[in-house]
């Protein structure tokens, strides 16, 4: 079931921009190890899990012009595979061995969930403020972009100035992307 749904997700396409951010910022930081590869996968697992859950919540039938996983496999399967991807991402974080990276990605995951809840409270509310809308975007999108960039600075043992610059870069890119 996981394999089948995973093939569907891969075939559905997508830009994979979040893991690409991790790969490119690792290069920017002159990182020479291999841990950025599993962390890029971790970032994509988190993102994909949120998409699976989001499609169930929104009762979506299409994503990127292709039938959603929940439309094909059902809500229960989509939620469980999303949970599996979250679990697998945390296994990859632990395997990496950096408590700081675990903290960054755990925080981003929590922020994404809070953004989803906030969005649920504003659905069909035309009086939603610009501030609330930006908070939703920051939570649901920019937080993972920022984390994807920040972990490269951590992996590369860069100072706080560079780490903060990459966080800002990720946040701004995430807002623009949304």
Where is each model-derived feature located?
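Mg2+-dependent prenyl diphosphate-binding active-site environment of isoprenoid biosynthetic enzymes
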Residues: 1-178
């Amino acid at each position: 079931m996981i394999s089948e749904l995973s093939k569907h997700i891969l075939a559905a396409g997508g830009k994979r921009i979040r893991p690409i951010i991790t790969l490119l910022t690792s290069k920017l930081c002159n990182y020479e190890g291999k841990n950025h590869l599993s962390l890029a996968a971790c970032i994509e697992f988190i993102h994909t899990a949120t998409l699976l859950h989001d499609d169930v919540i929104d009762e979506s039938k299409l994503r990127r012009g292709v039938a959603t996983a929940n439309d094909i496999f059902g809500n229960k399967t989509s939620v469980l595979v999303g949970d599996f991807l979250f679990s697998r991402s945390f296994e990859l974080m632990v395997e990496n061995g950096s408590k700081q990276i675990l903290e960054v990605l755990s925080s981003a995951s929590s922020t994404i969930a809070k953004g989803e809840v906030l969005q649920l409270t504003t659905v069909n509310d035309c009086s939603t403020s610009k501030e609330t809308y930006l908070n939703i975007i920051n939570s649901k999108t920019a937080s993972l972009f920022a984390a994807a960039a920040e972990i490269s600075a951590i992996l590369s043992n860069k100072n706080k100035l560079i780490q903060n610059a990459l966080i800002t870069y990720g946040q701004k890119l995430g807002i623009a992307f949304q």
